[in-house]
């Protein structure tokens, strides 16, 4: 009992199991518990924008050399593009080999498309230009109020750059933002005590509303997706961590609390503040974490990428739509564009799928109706894979920059360094280099 009282991940795991039981045995009660999960996620999202702001601003201001900021951002984007391309390709290959939709013989004309109307309408405004324009906020207050991570990130980079350019004159502001960061992470600690309650409510709602029968009806698709996500984590992300000199399984054990929070809430954002703190304590460069992790929530959605290609070919197979190899490559190319920013809008995965199917043309968009019932059961694997992918990304880019404290990272993963100890490579606050400026 003492271990349960001290261990957040055990509390969340127990809450997930109890929530599933309540949802299965008492469906109406389980469905009514949705506010518990929603409330917890809202509490976390309340903190994400200010935490991203404080972390990015202090990281850039202390870094001083703004050319380095650009270099880190470019390396992060390059890493994201390579890994998401691999994730999309793996989903495509598994769908070809496993054929989860084969034999369903669904007539698209018989499907009820009313439920997917909002997603197909949203696909009309999901182009690349719209996405890029959406990165620029109408005003700063609006970006923070809506919690738009990319808009907050853009403003934070500009604010940090301006602070670095001010040199000594900016020190009081930097001290304030640095202190604000400490306060925000302390609030995160308070909020995370409610994680078991949120996980219980979210899992009870999922099972109570959709039922186990829904899970079994498209079991092959769900099994394919979970297996593919696990394969990607073990092979690709494991390979990246090996290049960084670290063990994947020790890394997963290190972030187990965050994984179970995401498992219970089906939202990778619910663990974003904790993940940023964990990566810093692991020995990653604070400026790298501040830039890479928030960017990753729009550009490095590995789990979502696997889901998109798998779901696209599933719909084609279920509706007996023949897709040639050339068309599959076209799907891959379209998804490389449409998948960016899939997390920036509600129902982003479905909107991205609708946009892709519309662009490809020969796969019926009405087939999205097949996924509505089981999509919720795949969201946990999507969110967990996204979470792990963004954690590994911060380690990889730190290693690429030569700013990963590998000795500390190995010690932390081995459990020989208390997680509460601050990382050795974090800059001492709040010194701004005398020569810092916009041209570094």
UniProtKB/Swiss-Prot annotation:
Domain of life per record: Bacteria
Positions of region (Disordered): 419-440
Major place of residence: membrane
Transmembrane segments: 8-28, 40-60, 74-94, 147-167, 187-207, 221-241, 288-308, 354-374
UniProt-listed Pfam families: SDF (PF00375)
Keywords, sorted A to Z: Cell inner membrane, Cell membrane, Membrane, Symport, Transmembrane, Transmembrane helix, Transport
Entry's localization field: Cell inner membrane
InterPro entries, alphabetized: C4_dicarb_transport, Na-dicarboxylate_symporter, Na-dicarboxylate_symporter_CS, Na:dicarbo_symporter_sf
Keyword field contains Cell inner membrane: yes
GO molecular function: fumarate transmembrane transporter activity; malate:proton symporter activity; succinate transmembrane transporter activity
Membrane topology of this protein: Multi-pass membrane protein
GO biological process, one term: L-aspartate transmembrane transport
A GO CC annotation given for this chain: plasma membrane
PROSITE patterns membership: NA_DICARBOXYL_SYMP_1 (PS00713), NA_DICARBOXYL_SYMP_2 (PS00714)
Biological role: Responsible for the transport of dicarboxylates such as succinate, fumarate, and malate from the periplasm across the membrane.
Family: Belongs to the dicarboxylate/amino acid:cation symporter (DAACS) (TC 2.A.23) family.
Classification via PANTHER family: AEROBIC C4-DICARBOXYLATE TRANSPORT PROTEIN, PROTON/GLUTAMATE-ASPARTATE SYMPORTER
Name under which the protein is recorded: C4-dicarboxylate transport protein
């Amino acid at each position: 009992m003492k271990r349960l009282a001290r261990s957040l991940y055990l509390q969340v795991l127990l809450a997930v199991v109890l929530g599933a039981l309540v949802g299965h045995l008492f469906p109406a009660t389980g469905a009514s518990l949705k506010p518990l999960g929603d409330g917890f996620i809202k509490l976390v999202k309340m903190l994400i924008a200010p935490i991203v702001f404080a972390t990015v601003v202090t990281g850039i201001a202390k870094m001083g050399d703004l050319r380095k900021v650009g270099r880190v951002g470019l390396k992060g984007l390059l890493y994201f593009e390579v890994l998401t391309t691999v994730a999309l390709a793996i989903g495509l290959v598994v769908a070809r080999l496993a054929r989860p939709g084969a034999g369903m013989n669904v007539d698209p004309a018989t499907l009820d498309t009313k439920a997917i109307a909002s997603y197909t309408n949203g696909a009309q405004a999901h182009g690349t230009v719209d996405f890029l324009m959406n990165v620029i906020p109408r005003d700063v207050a609006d970006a923070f109020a809506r919690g738009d991570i990319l808009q907050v990130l853009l403003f934070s980079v500009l604010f940090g750059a301006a602070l670095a350019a001010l040199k000594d004159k900016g020190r009081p502001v930097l001290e304030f933002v640095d202190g604000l960061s400490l306060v925000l992470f302390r609030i995160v600690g308070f909020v995370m005590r409610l994680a078991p309650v949120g996980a219980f409510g979210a899992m009870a709602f999922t099972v109570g509303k959709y039922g186990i029968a829904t899970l079994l009806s498209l079991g092959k698709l769900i099994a394919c997706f979970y297996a593919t996500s696990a394969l990607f984590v073990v092979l690709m992300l494991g390979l990246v961590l090996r290049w960084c000199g670290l063990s994947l399984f020790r890394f997963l054990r290190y972030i187990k609390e965050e994984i179970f929070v995401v498992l219970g809430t089906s939202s990778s954002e619910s663990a974003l503040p904790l993940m940023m703190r964990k990566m810093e304590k692991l020995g990653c460069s604070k400026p790298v974490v501040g830039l890479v992790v928030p960017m990753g929530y729009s550009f490095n959605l590995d789990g979502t990428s696997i889901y998109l290609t798998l779901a696209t070919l599933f719909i084609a197979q279920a509706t007996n739509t023949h897709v040639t190899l050339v068309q599959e490559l076209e799907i891959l190319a379209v998804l490389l564009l449409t998948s960016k920013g899939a997390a920036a809008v509600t129902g982003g995965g479905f909107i991205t799928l609708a946009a892709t199917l519309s662009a490809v043309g020969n796969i019926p968009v009405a087939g999205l109706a097949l996924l509505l019932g089981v999509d919720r059961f795949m969201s946990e694997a999507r969110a967990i894979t996204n979470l792990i992918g963004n954690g590994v990304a911060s380690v990889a880019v730190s290693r690429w920059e030569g700013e990963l404290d590998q000795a500390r990272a190995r010690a932390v993963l081995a459990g020989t360094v208390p997680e509460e100890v601050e990382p050795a490579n974090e800059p001492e606050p709040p010194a701004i280099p005398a020569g810092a400026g916009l041209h570094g």
